[in-house]
Design a protein with these regions (language model features):
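N-terminal pre-Walker A segment at the start of P-loop NTPase domains
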Residues: 1-15
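Electropositive, glycine-dotted interaction segments
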Residues: 89-225
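Phosphate-binding P-loop
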Residues: 16-22, 273-275, 307
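Phosphate-binding glycine-rich loops of NTP-binding sites
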Residues: 23-62, 190-193, 267-276, 291, ...
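Conserved P-loop NTP-binding catalytic core
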Residues: 40-106
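C-terminal lobe/lid and adjacent interdomain/linker elements of RecA-like ASCE P-loop ATPase modules
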Residues: 2, 297-385
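P-loop (Walker A) phosphate-binding loop of NTP-binding proteins
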Residues: 11, 30, 286
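Conserved ABC ATPase signature
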Residues: 210, 215-218, 225-275, 280-293
Length: 385
């Protein structure tokens, strides 16, 4: 199942967003245009649906509803998210979940529901506020999505949204996890617990996935011959990734993750996440620390690794190399264009000049990136200290 359509109102950078989504989505825009905030809408729904989450925590973790609400919002201050779930982009609507949020005008100023609605096919499953909500307004501080006793009729939606994962690997966290003390972030968005996740996977699946990753790394990383997962009993059972490199010695040279390059660690984290499960995956700038030749192959690699289980992947990027792949289509590319009234989001295929240039043989990277360049960029050269 995938999110086939999303509508946002007054969410972060956006006054209004209304776009269809496919199995693969590329988010393209200048700095501070809202690419991360667009992805955060999916994480927000996940934080409501997951165990130990809920509406109050999801809003509180983001600094309150006033921090979430678009700065350009005026007469209509409600924050709204509406997602359509389908088995594929070509199939009809399977589920639809919509939520609107307000803030109390006095007292604790808690966020509460303006509405919560669920449809299955064309049938309305839930429409809040209902009579019980009107009798007890405190009920509107919680969604039915987060309550096991209340979401029985649409638990498939809750399980799907709870499964959304986000990845933006920080190599230093993998290389030196014990140097960063304190509780980790929920969902491990930066890969700190990658080795623990690998260790918890059953042995057969672990070997299969590591073999596939090894095959890719042998192409991308010179002299790498073998990748394995080991547990060092001398260190009290601490897990490690170990690579064998071709060397003048017959057995080769061994290195552990603390000696891997940033690019190698990011590639391992990316490939493992793509193999991990069928839930939607949010990737933040996967091109970082990678050689340009590898980056150019990422779209095709992601497509091959996800086409079997139809996993949805949403990718934010600044990379011309990543978008140079002729397989990246205008229908799966969203252009984010900032303005004083908020960022607009449109598919690249909606621009006639982009369609014409693509028909002429250019790539999305050639035609889309120049369109979203900030104005007056040449003035940056005039900057003096």
């Amino acid at each position: 199942m995938i999110v086939s359509h999303i509508t946002l109102k007054n969410w972060r950078n956006f006054q209004v967003v209304d776009v269809p989504l496919g199995d693969r989505v590329f988010l393209v825009g200048p700095n501070a245009s809202g690419k991360s905030n667009f992805l955060d809408a999916f994480r927000f729904l996940r934080d409501i649906a997951k165990a130990g989450g809920g509406l109050q925590r999801a809003v509180g973790d983001r600094g309150g509803l006033s921090k979430i609400r678009c700065l350009a919002a005026r007469r209509y201050p409600d924050v709204e998210i509406d997602v359509t779930l389908s088995s594929s982009p070509d199939n009809g609507i399977k589920w639809r979940y919509a939520i609107g949020m307000k803030q109390q005008t006095r007292g604790a100023r808690k966020p509460f529901l303006a509405y919560e609605r669920v449809w299955q096919d064309a049938n309305t499953i839930l429409d809040r506020p209902d009579d019980e909500d009107r009798r007890d307004a405190e009920r509107l501080t919680q969604t039915h999505l987060e309550q096991i006793s209340a979401n029985v009729d649409f638990r498939e939606v809750a399980r799907f949204l709870e499964s959304v994962s986000y990845l933006h690997v920080v190599p230093q966290l993998i290389r030196h996890p014990r140097a960063f003390t304190g509780p980790g972030l929920p969902g491990d968005p930066f890969g700190r617990s990658l080795l623990e996740r690998i260790g918890k996977t059953n042995d057969r699946t672990k070997r299969s996935r590591l073999k596939k990753i090894e095959t890719a790394l042998r192409i991308a990383v010179p002299q790498l011959k073998k990748l394995s997962y080991v547990v060092d009993s001398a260190e009290g059972g601490i897990p490690h990734l170990e690579a064998v490199y071709d060397h003048w010695r017959p057995q080769g040279a061994k290195q552990r993750e603390s000696e891997f390059s940033d690019g190698t660690l990011r590639l391992v984290g990316l490939l493992w996440s793509l193999l991990e499960r069928e839930a939607p995956l949010l990737l933040e700038e996967p091109e970082l620390s990678l050689n340009a030749a590898i980056v150019r192959k990422l779209p095709a690699l992601i497509h091959r690794m996800t086409r079997k289980n139809r996993r949805q992947v949403l990718i934010s990027t600044h990379s011309a190399e990543l978008l140079s792949d002729k397989g990246v289509g205008p229908d799966e590319t969203l252009l984010l264009v900032p303005s004083p009234e908020g960022t607009t989001v449109r598919r690249a295929s909606e621009y006639k000049d982009i369609r014409d240039l693509l028909e002429g043989g250019l790539s999305i990277g050639d035609v889309a990136l120049p369109r979203i360049d900030p104005e007056n960029m040449q003035q940056l050269l005039l900057f003096e200290t």
